[in-house]
């Protein structure tokens, strides 16, 4: 879920940088257009389609503009470079990176030759090249270019100039997506300080960095800090831009996503619906920005176990993205994965498999077969087979995803840790404990080093290792790990979070299996209360906890208590089975 808020924040940040350059290059194009009678009309149409994100319509116009520039000004003129850059921008938004890169490089070569390698306009083109590499997962290239842009702008404008802040923000966003949060935070803080000084603490430009910094804290599960920043940004935008401005809707969406990740689904739903109403009004019902929010609403309903409602939102988001961005765009792939997960949880495995495979094909085509994106899709597909207990299919996919993550993201990255944990979980379920333990231990060590000993993902890894020891019958090793996980989750996520409920349930299992029924019962009861409150009384997770509680009562010889609890669990399952399509696998 977190990739959704982060992805939203990332695009909003990138669009600002793109928009600033577009404004500059379009202005230059219009000046040059006086020499060509049809150029003003072409530029006007291009601007309209670009700003409304109708890229499939903008592309042929941008191609025509470039052709005219080449004919009238020559292949090495700055005006031709501007047209090449604009066409590259369109291709980048369409996810056609192979077409975009040579155009950017051509524009860059011309600008460097005419203006020199240290000119601010060269930095603007370099910035777009860095965006391209960031989106294709070539982070080392992007980092090097952003650092060059920063050096140029600091020299040209000074270390405390808003242009410098723009680059600091972009470089911080790159580190954010690389999972290097310790590098990202001081850059965001510096950018925020510059903007507060240059524009004031309540300026919309200041709100941009508040949004990005908030997303960083969400990624670290520091929801208290994130909530305050998003609330401040929302207050600024509502006051300065109005409650119905698109940027106000972006902040509503970020705050809503924070509430979603905190398990506060009602708050999240209300804010997302507000943001949707604004965006539909300002951008239209079929705009990519509308698709972002529609997709996010789907994630809320999915988290609540309202899979049918989620499906309708994911289907709508998919339809918009396929139409506006194309069937092979990365954003289309993201929605395919979200819809696949929804079908997976509805036990419609054949539908889920088809969508996951399509999402994987998009990632392999756009980013490459050994990209972080492809590894993520392989992980999803492996998890689908795991849930179907098709371990023979699941294992090689996890292993392939792990090899890619280690190569692309690094052996100590959180992406690698996630795959290690999943592969360890697979071996645990297969009873291959000797294979599982070193993987789970390695995942825990990575999270501890990368995110800290009290991060929720560290808690999850500790809990996974505890579960493994419990399955091995090594209860003395398991208990302190489960207790550690619970302590972290209660502190960082809250006592009523769903992750807290899961750990309570696992700890209850440990005490049940060791015959410590007096300790197990209140843990099961507490987990049940949380799940009923957040998910509703008829959710499958509620039925699972009821089963655990019934088993406890049977073991204690309390059949009068066990019977109604067991019957309630069976009733929930029967109702769910009746209301879902027949399982397809």
Descriptions of predicted regions:
Residues 1-585:
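Intrinsic-disorder-linked linear interaction elements in eukaryotic regulatory proteins
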């Amino acid at each position: 879920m977190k990739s959704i808020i982060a992805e939203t924040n990332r695009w909003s940040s990138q669009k600002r940088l793109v928009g600033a350059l577009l404004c500059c290059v379009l202005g230059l194009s219009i000046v040059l257009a006086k020499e060509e009678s049809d150029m003003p009309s072409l530029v006007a149409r291009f601007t309209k389609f670009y700003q409304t994100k109708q890229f499939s319509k903008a592309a042929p116009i941008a191609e025509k503009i470039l052709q005219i520039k080449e004919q009238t000004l020559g292949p090495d003129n700055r005006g031709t470079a501007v047209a090449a850059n604009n066409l590259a921008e369109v291709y980048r938004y369409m996810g056609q990176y192979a077409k975009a890169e040579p155009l950017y490089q051509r524009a860059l070569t011309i600008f460097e030759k005419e203006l020199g390698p240290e000119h601010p306009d060269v930095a603007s083109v370099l910035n777009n090249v860095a965006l391209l590499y960031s989106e294709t997962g070539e982070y080392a290239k992007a980092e090097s270019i952003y650092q060059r842009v920063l050096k140029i702008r600091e020299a040209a404008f000074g270390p405390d100039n808003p242009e410098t802040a723009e680059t600091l923000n972009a470089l911080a966003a790159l580190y954010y997506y690389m999972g290097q949060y310790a590098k990202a935070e001081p850059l965001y803080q510096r950018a925020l300080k510059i903007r507060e000084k240059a524009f004031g603490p309540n300026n919309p430009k200041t709100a941009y960095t508040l949004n990005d910094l908030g997303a960083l804290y969400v990624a670290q599960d520091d929801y208290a800090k994130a909530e305050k920043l998003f609330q401040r940004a929302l207050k600024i935008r509502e006051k300065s831009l109005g409650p119905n401005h698109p940027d106000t809707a972006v902040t509503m969406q970020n705050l809503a996503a924070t509430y979603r990740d905190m398990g506060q689904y009602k708050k999240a739903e209300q804010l997302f619906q507000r943001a949707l109403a604004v965006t539909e009004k300002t951008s239209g019902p079929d705009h990519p920005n509308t698709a972002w929010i529609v997709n996010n609403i789907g994630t809320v309903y999915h988290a609540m176990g309202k899979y049918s409602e989620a499906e309708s939102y994911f289907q709508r988001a998919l339809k918009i993205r396929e139409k506006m961005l194309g069937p092979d765009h990365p954003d289309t792939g993201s929605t395919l994965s979200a819809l696949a997960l929804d079908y997976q949880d509805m036990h419609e495995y054949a539908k889920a498999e088809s969508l996951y495979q399509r999402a994987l094909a998009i990632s392999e085509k756009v980013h490459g077969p050994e990209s972080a994106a492809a590894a993520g899709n392989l992980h999803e597909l492996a998890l689908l087979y795991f849930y179907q207990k098709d371990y023979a299919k699941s294992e090689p996919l996890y292993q392939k995803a792990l090899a890619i993550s280690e190569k692309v993201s690094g052996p100590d990255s959180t992406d690698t840790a996630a795959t290690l944990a999943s592969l360890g979980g697979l071996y645990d379920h297969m009873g291959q404990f000797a294979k599982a333990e070193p993987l789970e231990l390695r995942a825990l060590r990575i999270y501890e080093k990368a995110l800290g000993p009290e991060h929720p993902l560290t808690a999850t890894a500790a809990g996974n290792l505890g579960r493994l020891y419990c399955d091995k019958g090594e209860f003395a090793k398991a208990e302190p790990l489960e207790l550690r996980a619970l302590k972290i989750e209660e502190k960082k996520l809250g006592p009523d979070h769903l992750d807290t409920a899961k750990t309570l349930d696992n700890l209850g299992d440990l005490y049940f299996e060791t015959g410590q029924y007096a300790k197990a019962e209140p843990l099961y009861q507490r987990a049940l209360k949380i799940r009923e409150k957040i998910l509703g009384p008829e959710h499958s997770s509620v039925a699972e906890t009821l089963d655990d509680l019934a088993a406890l009562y049977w073991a204690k010889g309390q059949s009068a208590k066990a019977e109604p609890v067991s019957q309630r669990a069976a009733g929930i399952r029967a109702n769910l089975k009746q209301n879902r399509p027949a399982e397809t696998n």
